[in-house]
């Protein structure tokens, strides 16, 4: 309609229509209704999709006065040029580009958003033309160069806008204008652009900045011009240079990296290795450093230049020269000045880049004096930024610039100090001492430290200001603490004794304070007014000292065997000749006494004495509890103590001496195998656990840390053997089995972990009699209590009573804990034990079908058992588990089918259930990949009967499970993204791994599954659509192999061919899906060649325009030319996918017009 109107000279009517629509869209909500607004939006959408709108758009740009209409005209030109590229003459495109550029130049007062959109259209035209070399940037650069040299600020700003538009459009393969072209297309354009055109832009920018450097006293307008060019320089230097031959998937990964380092091609060598360029940016920064916005850009430019690497350097010598020159420039820029807040992050980024990007041998090759000045500067800045970061914490600033800068510098230190190849031992010791001392000082209260001190004195934070939601310091500052701990190890000679003396001093003071409070309470119990300021300061000091000690003595180890850090081991070995072992053991074993009161206390091992200092903190806490002073204690300190003890025990307690070249004698004597020290310390730690669970049951985090310590004590057989020799262990087990207070007050997650620990302990090296005793005292009571409850005649009537529900919940949590404790050597006993429960749990599903939290917990028990045990089960046992899981799903499905979810909470509950069911099915499916049950050795002696002859695979079970829950998957539930993704991942997984199972499915399930795939491709997110396309490919391949042209799957794939054809040819789709869609399309074309030809013929027959008809026919012929007839051959498929890229570039979007 629009195109026809334009062709008939009806442009004024079109303009009037668009201007009226713009008025509606721009009107306040009170003036227009929803329907009017939608109609107005439809007019613009229809206009933008109209065929060849160029003449009418030009007319609009020249005559309309409505900015929004001008903006839409520019957008319509941009989209139509790409859409109709193959139909346009090259001269028409060139004149269109010239028209747009001239239009902007002649109208300096255009609204910014209109100007930017017109320039974006120019950039898109240049980009699309760069691929077939019909347009290049040379003429544009010539014009821009003239604009820059005009000296007119308005014109220079416009020149900058033109360059920025080009840069933005070419810079990324994934974030450019959505013009329906593939990532490869954008990637190829980017590669061509970055070779020469990008450097041209940089040179133009440098010219402007040189002019800026020369000028004095700039007016505001000129300053604004230079700021824009500086931002442009930053954009160029932050360019993510694409390496050659990078596939689509890798382009996306490559471009998603956050920290882009400057790695230009060789062609940039002359430009960037010219020392005047680097000097220019240092000079510019010195000139504008007090202007916050400009300083951000100039520092970012310098940070990018500090990351220069790759083929731009011809040899190592040029790298050394560049680095030396840069460090000189940096030291000259920052020496003797007070760094502004806005400079901190930038300067730390520069230093971080220099240290991490330049190889260490280049760093050490610069003149010694220069390197020494650089490292001293790094130490000074680290301490200074650390102090400012601590101040930010006190003032609770939103923008923590110094904290970010400090973190970067600490990471830089780690890079340096961990390199013993280029720096001799002790090279950084003094610097490490400096940074470590500064950190400790910032975290201690006055007078020893500066915590909470502002420039004007004390700014102490009130206790209630600390938010409940605040992350724990040990998590929030884990990277910082890891760096400080590493620096502490480098300077162990200084740092370990320092921490010991600070901790011992605080313990003495804490003990004294608590005694004073006790006396005060005894003297006047009613007074109650105790000044806690001193205590709070002590607790905060101890908190930070324990955290630093924990990170100094042990590393974070996830999934690895924790090892004593070599620096700590060497330090202990080095001084072992000066150590008296007996005194060391006495200090370790007397946490109730002051270390200095023990004769010869100075001849103890320093590492063990540091551990002893923390045991003394723990002892003061225990004594305060016994003296009924719990209300004065800090739960945070309690958490810190057990966190440290867990971390320490994992690494040092009964360390495996085979893992070390040499071991410290004091360590092996104090807590090695078969020593009194290790037995004593295990007993001490166990006592701590039991005391904490009794006293702190309401403090969930502290109770959780405490049971984690218990798990650490029993997860290794060697430690567990010592634990089970303690009477306390058996008392704890019996108490838990009886559910007597205070253990039954613990939260459910803590009870679950406690059960896990008790089970792990139960499988230590006990004799048969002990094992039987353990079974009788720990696991049997659980079973007995459970059966007593559910076998009561009136169970149905009393099941909702609070006491009964608590008993059931506690049992279910305990079952999860038991499952979590599964290992290959206990799976036989635990599986048989748990199976009895699982069958009873299915009965509970009926009883509690209207109690969502119980249903959820029952499913979770099954999820845990499947997750932990399925991989160890032989065929018969796996069959038992499969049957139990399917019965569970049948009951769940029966209870929930057709049930009306009246409120959001009920829907949320079902969402949680189904998410767990998806996890259960995924866990069962893992049996097909992870199977340790080659022999049923682990079940010898535990087999109730022989395996049956049924062979059912996990895939069969999972498909049957999917059949049960599919009817529950309502459209509303699939709106939960995590559930939707989990569901589609599961069915795609099944289709990819077991495509042969799909045709054998019952008819209803097969239809449901096909409908799910259709729904996923047409109505879900692009991630789900991609999963469905990935599922269709193996199904089509399976169909081709089977060669059954009358099967239901054959008919379904024919329908999918039409869907994928429409998606690729007729609809706008996310270009990132082109590969998945292309692979599915190719396989479907191989399977249904006649239908594909029919689809093409039908499409061509609808084309009225002979030019479009011919172009489309040629494009389709070319598409299948490389694979005629198409076969399921990888080489042919790859050729087809390459042709498809070209096809999409030429005709993609051509048919999405009105």
From Swiss-Prot:
Family annotation (InterPro entries): ARM-like, ARM-type_fold, XPO1_C_dom, XPO4/7-like
Superkingdom of origin organism: Eukaryota
Keyword Protein transport: yes
Pfam families with a match to the protein in the record: CRM1_C (PF08767)
Keywords: Cytoplasm, Nucleus, Protein transport, Transport
Chief site of localization: cytoplasm
GO MF assignments: nuclear export signal receptor activity
A single Gene Ontology CC term: cytoplasm
GO BP terms: protein export from nucleus
Subcellular location: Cytoplasm; Nucleus
Family label: Belongs to the exportin family.
Function of the protein: Mediates the nuclear export of proteins (cargos) with broad substrate specificity.
Designated name of the protein: Exportin-4
């Amino acid at each position: 309609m629009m195109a026809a109107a334009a062709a008939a000279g009806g442009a004024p009517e079109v303009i009037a229509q668009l201007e009226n629509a713009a008025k509606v869209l721009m009107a306040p909500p009170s003036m227009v209704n929803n329907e009017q607004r939608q109609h107005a939006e439809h007019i613009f959408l229809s206009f933008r999709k109209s065929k060849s709108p160029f003449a009418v758009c030009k007319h609009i740009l020249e005559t309309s006065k409505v900015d929004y209409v001008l903006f839409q005209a520019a957008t319509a030109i941009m989209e139509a040029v790409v859409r109709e590229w193959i139909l346009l003459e090259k001269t028409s495109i060139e004149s269109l580009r010239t028209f747009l550029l001239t239009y902007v130049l002649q109208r300096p007062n255009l609204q910014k958003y209109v100007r930017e959109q017109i320039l974006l259209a120019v950039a898109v035209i240049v980009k699309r033309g760069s691929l077939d070399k019909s347009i290049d940037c040379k003429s544009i650069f010539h014009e821009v160069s003239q604009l820059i040299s005009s000296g007119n600020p308005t014109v220079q700003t416009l020149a900058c806008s033109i360059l920025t538009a080009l840069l933005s459009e070419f810079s990324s393969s994934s974030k450019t204008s959505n013009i329906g072209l593939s990532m490869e297309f954008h990637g190829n354009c980017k590669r061509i652009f970055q070779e020469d055109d990008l450097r041209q832009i940089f040179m133009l920018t440098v010219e402007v900045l040189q002019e800026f450097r020369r000028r004095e006293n700039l007016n505001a307008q000129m300053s604004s011009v230079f700021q824009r060019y500086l931002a442009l320089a930053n954009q160029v230097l932050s360019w993510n240079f694409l390496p050659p031959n990078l596939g689509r998937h890798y382009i996306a990964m490559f471009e998603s990296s956050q920290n882009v380092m400057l790695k230009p091609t060789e062609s940039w060598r002359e430009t960037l290795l010219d020392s005047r360029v680097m000097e220019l940016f240092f000079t510019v920064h010195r000139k504008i450093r007090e202007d916050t916005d400009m300083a951000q850009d100039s520092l970012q430019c310098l940070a990018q230049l500090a990351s220069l690497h790759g083929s731009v350097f011809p040899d190592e010598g040029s790298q050394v020269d560049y680095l030396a020159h840069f460090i000189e420039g940096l030291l000259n820029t920052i020496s003797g000045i007070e760094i502004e807040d806005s400079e901190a992050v930038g300067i730390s980024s520069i230093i971080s880049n220099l240290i991490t990007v330049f190889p260490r041998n280049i760093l050490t090759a610069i003149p010694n004096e220069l390197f020494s000045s650089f490292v001293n500067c790094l130490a000074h800045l680290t301490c200074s930024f650390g102090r400012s970061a601590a101040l930010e914490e006190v003032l609770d600033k939103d923008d923590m610039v110094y904290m970010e800068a400090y973190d970067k510098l600490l990471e830089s230190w780690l890079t340096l100090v961990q390199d013993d190849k280029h720096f001799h031992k002790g090279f950084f010791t003094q610097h490490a001492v400096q940074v470590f001392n500064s950190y400790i000082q910032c975290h201690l209260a006055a007078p020893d430290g500066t915590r909470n001190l502002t420039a004007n004195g004390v700014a102490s934070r009130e206790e209630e200001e600390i938010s409940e939601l605040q992350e724990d310091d040990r998590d929030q500052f884990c990277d910082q603490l890891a760096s400080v701990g590493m620096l502490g190890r480098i300077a162990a000679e200084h740092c370990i004794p320092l921490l010991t003396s600070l901790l011992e001093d605080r313990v003495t003071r804490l003990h004294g304070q608590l005694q004073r409070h006790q006396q005060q309470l005894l003297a006047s119990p009613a007074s109650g007014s105790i000044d806690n300021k001193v205590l709070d300061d002590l607790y905060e000091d101890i908190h930070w000292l324990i955290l630093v000690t924990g990170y100094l003595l042990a590393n974070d180890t996830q999934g690895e065997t924790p090892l004593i850090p070599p620096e700590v081991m060497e330090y202990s070995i080095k001084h072992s000749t000066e150590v008296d072992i007996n005194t060391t053991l006495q200090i370790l074993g007397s946490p109730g006494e002051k270390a200095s009161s023990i004769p010869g206390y100075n001849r103890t091992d320093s590492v063990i004495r540091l551990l002893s200092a923390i045991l003394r903190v723990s002892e003061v806490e225990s004594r305060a509890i016994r003296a009924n002073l719990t209300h004065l204690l800090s739960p945070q300190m309690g958490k810190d103590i057990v966190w440290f003890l867990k971390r320490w025990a994992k690494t040092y307690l009964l360390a495996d001496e085979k893992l070390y070249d040499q071991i410290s004698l004091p360590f092996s004597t104090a807590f090695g195998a078969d020593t009194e020290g290790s037995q004593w310390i295990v007993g001490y730690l166990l006592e701590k656990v039991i005391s904490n669970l009794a006293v702190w049951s309401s403090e969930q985090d502290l109770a959780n840390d405490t049971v984690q310590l218990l798990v650490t004590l029993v997860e290794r057989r060697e430690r567990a053997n010592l634990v089970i020799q303690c009477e306390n262990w058996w008392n704890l087990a019996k108490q838990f089995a009886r559910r007597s207070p205070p253990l039954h007050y613990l939260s459910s997650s803590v009870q679950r972990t406690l059960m896990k620990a008790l089970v792990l302990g139960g499988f230590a090296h006990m004799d048969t009699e002990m094992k039987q005793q353990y079974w009788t005292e720990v696991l049997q009571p659980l079973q007995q209590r459970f059966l007593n409850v559910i076998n009561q005649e009136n169970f149905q009537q009393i099941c909702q009573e609070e006491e009964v529900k608590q008993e059931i919940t506690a049992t279910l949590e305990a079952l999860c804990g038991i499952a979590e404790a599964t290992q290959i050597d206990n799976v036989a006993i635990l599986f048989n034990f748990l199976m009895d429960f699982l069958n009873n749990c299915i009965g509970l599903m009926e009883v509690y079908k209207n109690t969502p939290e119980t249903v959820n917990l029952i499913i979770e028990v099954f999820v845990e058992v499947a997750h932990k045990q399925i991989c160890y089960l032989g065929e018969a046992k796996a069959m038992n588990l499969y049957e139990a899981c399917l019965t569970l799903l049948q009951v769940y499905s029966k209870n929930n089918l057709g049930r009306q979810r009246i409120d959001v909470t009920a829907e949320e509950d079902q969402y949680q259930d189904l998410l767990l069911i998806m996890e259960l099915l995924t866990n069962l499916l893992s049996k097909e990949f992870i199977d340790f049950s080659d022999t049923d050795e682990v079940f010898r002696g535990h087999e109730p009967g022989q395996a049956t002859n049924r062979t059912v695979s996990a895939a069969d079970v999972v498909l049957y499970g999917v059949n049960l829950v599919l009817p529950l998957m309502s459209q509303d539930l699939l709106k939960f993204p995590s559930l939707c993704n989990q569901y589609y991942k599961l069915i795609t997984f099944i289709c990819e791994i077991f495509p042969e199972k799909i045709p054998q499915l019952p008819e209803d399930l097969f239809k449901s599954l096909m409908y799910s795939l259709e729904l996923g491709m047409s109505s879900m997110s692009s991630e789900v659509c991609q999963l469905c396309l990935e599922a269709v490919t193996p199904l089509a391949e399976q169909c081709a192999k089977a060669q059954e042209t009358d099967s239901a799957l054959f008919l379904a794939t024919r329908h999918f061919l039409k869907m994928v054809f429409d998606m690729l040819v007729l609809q706008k789709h996310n270009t990132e899906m082109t590969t998945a869609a292309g692979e599915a399309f190719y396989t479907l074309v191989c399977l249904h060649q006649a239908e594909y030809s029919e689809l093409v013929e039908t499409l061509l027959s609808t084309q009225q325009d002979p030019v479009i008809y011919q172009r489309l026919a040629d494009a389709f012929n070319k598409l299948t030319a490389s694979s005629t007839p198409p076969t399921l051959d990888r080489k042919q498929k790859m050729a087809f996918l390459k042709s498809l890229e070209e096809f999409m570039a030429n005709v993609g979007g051509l048919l999405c017009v009105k």
